[in-house]
Each structure stands twice: as structure tokens, then as C-alpha cells.
From Swiss-Prot:
Gene from which this protein is expressed: rplL
UniProt KW Transit peptide keyword: no
Record InterPro entries: Ribosomal_bL12, Ribosomal_bL12_C, Ribosomal_bL12_C/ClpS-like, Ribosomal_bL12_oligo_N_sf
Any single GO BP term: translation
Protein name: Large ribosomal subunit protein bL12
Coiled-coil annotated residue ranges, if any: none
Protein family per UniProt: Belongs to the bacterial ribosomal protein bL12 family.
Domain of life (superkingdom): Bacteria
Organism whose genome encodes this protein: Ehrlichia canis (strain Jake)
């Protein structure tokens, strides 16, 4: 690849919305064989005890919990779930129709900003979402 191609690729990646960027990261992790959750979960943190205590004080990884949805908004909720995950139409429909609260992507942790954006997108579609 030439430098021009790389620059173009960088521009395309930077123009992705948060859900599509998360989908890209998931696919790249799968393609490259990274452990689920990324490399940082496999490598112990370096540094003194002060860094560890400040990390314990402020939560940085959040789960997005899909709780329920408004019955009249079912189609838009399914579309939003598909947009925020790698699920196909059938899987997204089954996910939405499944009773009870469940993680949007099981075991997937999001940064606070990303979790808030996903929550807003799903709530705008008619879903009730919890961030833990």
C-alpha cells in the first residue's frame, strides 16, 4: 500500500460512527486472533500502587445492558441493535424479543463515552438501556 492509500484509509476509519468503529475493532480482533477484550486484559499493569488505587476508584469499562423496549418501536429497536452489533437481522430480532435484561454484546466492555452513545442510540429507537 502506498502512503496515499493509508491516508485515505485513516480518513475513512476516522469518519466511522462509534458503533461502526466498535464493529471494526471486533472484526480486526477476530481476524488477527487477539483474545476477547483486547490485549490489555492479558497484560498485567506496570507501575506503582498509586496507579492501581486510582484505577480502582474510577470505573473505565462499562457493560451495556438491554432491558426492554416499547412494543410499537420494535422494528426501530431491531435496526438500532443491528447497527450497534455484528448481529444479522434474525439474530437481532431474537435478541430483542428475548425476555429479561441482557448484555448487548456478552462480555464486551465499553469506554464511558462509547457506552453513552450506544445507550442514546438504542433509547432514541425505543429501548430501555442500563449502563453498568
Amino acid at each position: 500500500m502506498s502512503t496515499v492509500d493509508i491516508d485515505s484509509l485513516v480518513e475513512q476509519i476516522c469518519s466511522l460512527d462509534l458503533c461502526k468503529a466498535a464493529e471494526l475493532v471486533d472484526k480486526m480482533e477476530q481476524k488477527l486472533g487477539f483474545p476477547k477484550g483486547g490485549l490489555l486484559t492479558a497484560v498485567p499493569a506496570a507501575g506503582g500502587g498509586q496507579a492501581e488505587s486510582s484505577a480502582a476508584e474510577e470505573k473505565t469499562d462499562f457493560s451495556v445492558i438491554f432491558d426492554s423496549y416499547a412494543a410499537d418501536k420494535k422494528i426501530s429497536v431491531i435496526k438500532a441493535v443491528r447497527e450497534c452489533t455484528n448481529l444479522g437481522l434474525k439474530e437481532a430480532k431474537e435478541f430483542v424479543e428475548k425476555e429479561g435484561a441482557k448484555e448487548l454484546i456478552e462480555g464486551k466492555k465499553y469506554k464511558k463515552e462509547e457506552a453513552e452513545e450506544i445507550k442514546k442510540k438504542l433509547e432514541d429507537a425505543g429501548a430501555k438501556v442500563i449502563i453498568k
